[in-house]
Amino acid sequence: MIKQLSISAIAATLSSALAFAADTESESLSGGLFTTTMRDAAAYRQTIPFPDEKRQLQHLDGFDSLAQKWVMPLLPTGVWGRGPLSNAESCLGCHINSGRGTVPAKSNEPIRTMLVRVSVPGKNANGGPMPHPRYGDQINFMGVEHEVRGEAEVFIDWREKPVQFADGETVSLREPKLRIEQLVYGPLGDDTLFSPRVTQPLLGLGLLEAVPDSTLEALSAAPKPHGIKGKTNRVWDFAAKRMAIGRFGHKATNPNLSQQIMAAFHDDMGVTSNLFPTETCTDVQKSCRNAFSAPQPELGPNQFVPLLFYVQANAVPARRNAGDVDVKRGEKLFTEAACAACHTPELKTGEYAPIPEMSHQVIRPFTDLLLHDMGEALSDNRPDFEAGGREWRTAPLWGLGLAKTVNGHTDLLHDGRARTTAEAILWHGGEANFSREVFLKMPKADRQALLLFLDSL
């Protein structure tokens, strides 16, 4: 990757970006100053042109770390430290183009860019899920050739079920059923709890980290219509050694980006770090426990520091066609259907020491970062700290309209079951049941306007 950037070139591009911000309607600036006009497959991996060359290059180094292939110790190419059990060789292996993973469309295809959490009833010492005694916190399908066998293969069987709108139009929803085969380390047991998860896009995460805890607490306490509630998750902060408000992950189980990244390295690639210093091997996995390991911790500052900055500094794509008449009408319908009661259109960041330019920005992520009961149909029946099985964090909607451009698909929700935005809405239940019913009763022209608005984000 070429990194020869001059200060004058960066300054000129920054001036251009600031001019764009000044000339653009504020509602189009999804990430405030950290908004990018990029609309192609690279739209989820942009940042602003920093006035200093050091940070500009650090963002490029961070993407290199994201793409870096991690290998088993003693292999000749790549960074040592992956495994013995893992699900990917690099961050980009699942966060494709800094975006979402994919779900297998056919029942004979094993999962490769998503994961399955596992646990048993009860809580661990920190208040989180109790790891499965044989398989730990998640199923890892990759091992070490000739030494450590991967734990299992996971497949998804799909069942189609029709849903009819009030005007007679029918949509087919697909319901997933996990099938876990080739279990190497013994049976799972009838009390095992499962949660399939698709990787989420890496855009605007620093901006979300910059939103003060007090804002989330105020959103939780605010009165809401139609039985909507919303609550924060209280999770374990491994660095501070105390409970904290969670905001990252499908159930808001990590309080900050440092922990989110280190947890992903540990659980998905078997890479140890200062926060997670031991391998993922369980007591019964003797070959895993006896396997050669790289010097600890495996995730060092040379990889982690630029990667953290990359994730923190990633910008958000600007809205497209925000002033279009039908898009405006769709936005009004979005509010009238109470979608905005959870998908909060606008937040403001506080002081943000990692990137001061992100401080006091008005952003439009369309999330409250709170947990909401989404109904039995979306339940994984697996508690995670204070998040119940039916509760999920409100997914940010910014960048949604470019999902297919970036990743080639629009598989949405925590397990990728929704193939379109319309399907995602129709899976909503629980606190979102009112919104779903309103959508079902809308005339087709109104449904199209609402979807057009969502596609503009």
Residue spans for each PLM region:
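Short intrinsically disordered, low-complexity coil segments enriched in acidic
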Residues: 2, 17-20
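Bacterial N-terminal signal peptides that target proteins for export
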Residues: 1-9
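Periplasmic c-type cytochrome electron-transfer domains
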Residues: 20-457
